[in-house]
């Protein structure tokens, strides 16, 4: 069954909110859950990347002017970089977990940094898909989404 962009975003946003919460609490009892969620995020972000390149970016490039092509290519590059950064950090994380306990001081800032980049990417994709919306319209949409899935996911 084919998924939509909103369905991907609706899956990714709560995952990030949960990651933020886990990193904030730093509960040693959640280490196994953190490992699972990090692995889950690799799969979801990789699937999202394939989807968004095929179903969103490719159609946006079809017949686009030079300005639009440049903007979409920036989005594509950032999407690829997100996936690669996640894979690299997960490999590093898994390697460390085999020899040492979870280092929250190392993991928490990486989670915040990565989730911030994903949120920014999602906002840029949404803005590219709805360029006629004003800043106020986008702010209202973010406020609505915040009410729906939590402040960290907006």
Residue ranges of predicted features:
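Small-residue-biased structural context
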Residues: 1-154
């Amino acid at each position: 069954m084919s998924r939509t962009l909103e369905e991907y975003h609706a899956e990714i946003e709560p995952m990030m909110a949960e990651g933020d919460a886990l990193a904030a609490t730093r509960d040693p009892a959640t280490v196994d859950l953190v490992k699972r969620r990090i692995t889950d995020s690799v799969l979801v972000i990789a699937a999202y990347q394939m989807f968004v390149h095929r179903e969103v970016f490719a159609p946006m490039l079809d017949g686009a002017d030079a300005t639009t092509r440049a903007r979409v290519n920036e989005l594509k590059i950032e999407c690829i970089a997100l996936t690669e950064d996640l894979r690299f950090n997960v490999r590093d994380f898994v390697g460390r977990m085999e020899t040492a306990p979870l280092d929250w001081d190392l993991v928490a800032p990486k989670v915040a940094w990565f989730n911030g980049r994903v949120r920014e990417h999602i906002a840029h994709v949404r803005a590219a898909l709805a360029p006629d919306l004003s800043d106020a319209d986008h702010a209202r949409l973010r406020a609505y989404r915040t009410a729906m899935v939590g402040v960290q996911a907006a």
